[in-house]
Amino acid sequence: MLVKDCMTRHPIMISPETPAVKAQTLMIENKVRHLPVVGDGKRILGLITRDTLMVPPSDLGSLNVWEISRLLSDIKAEDVMVKENALITIDPDATLESAAELMIKEKVGCLPVIEEEVVVGIITEVDMLAKLSELLGGGVEGVRATIRVPNKVGEYAKIFSAVSEKGWGIYASGGAAAPKQPDYWDLVIKVRSASKEELLKVLEGIEGQEVIDIRTIP
């Protein structure tokens, strides 16, 4: 799965001259937290976030309400945006996991997606979570099970074979290293057409594996 499969295409974009107040209004009205700032031909110049629009109280000093209003109306996107040279971006053909690793490493909540110096999309932590939910079958009825398996070749196959022999289908799955147990992995599966009791009986019959959690998702 690649960034281009999960990113938000055609994000709302603003110019450097856009008043910061208008940028904030756009964010509120469209329920977004990031706005790419672009120049001619959608070339990336910077990024506005909710945090960059925060004015420290110390900057307001002893100004009265009218002076504060005038000060805020004079602030432009280019005055508060994350500049291009400090911006972390990604290619649309990058893998989803590389995007996640980059966001974690750089501690950022989004990555503008750039192709040939043009903004073609934006991928955010919300996009990542939405895709994770989809990969694990979020919002779909079924039985969800977490199985701890030895980190050996063929362990996943045992589960898929045992389930398929019953005529059931695994329509979502995902795995990760077990916490503090480097020799084991936790595999999450979601199965339709089986009851929790039926699936549990099959999984408990697989030697060397342990069912950590099993529940029916209505």
Role assignments for model-derived ranges:
Residues 1-10, 50-87, 91, 96-104, ...:
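Tandem CBS (Bateman) regulatory domains
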Residues 1-50, 58-59:
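Basic, Lys/Arg-rich alpha-helical nucleic-acid-recognition elements, primarily the DNA-binding modules
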Residues 27, 35-51, 103, 111-126, ...:
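A glycine-centered beta-loop-beta connector
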Residues 33, 109, 169:
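Short acidic/polar active-site loop segments enriched in Thr and Asp
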Residues 37, 82, 113, 175, ...:
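Hydrophobic/anchoring residues in structured secondary elements
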Residues 177-185, 215-218:
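Short proline/glycine- and acidic-rich turn/helix-capping motifs at secondary-structure junctions
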Residues 184-193:
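Short basic, glycine-rich beta-strand/loop surfaces that mediate nucleic-acid
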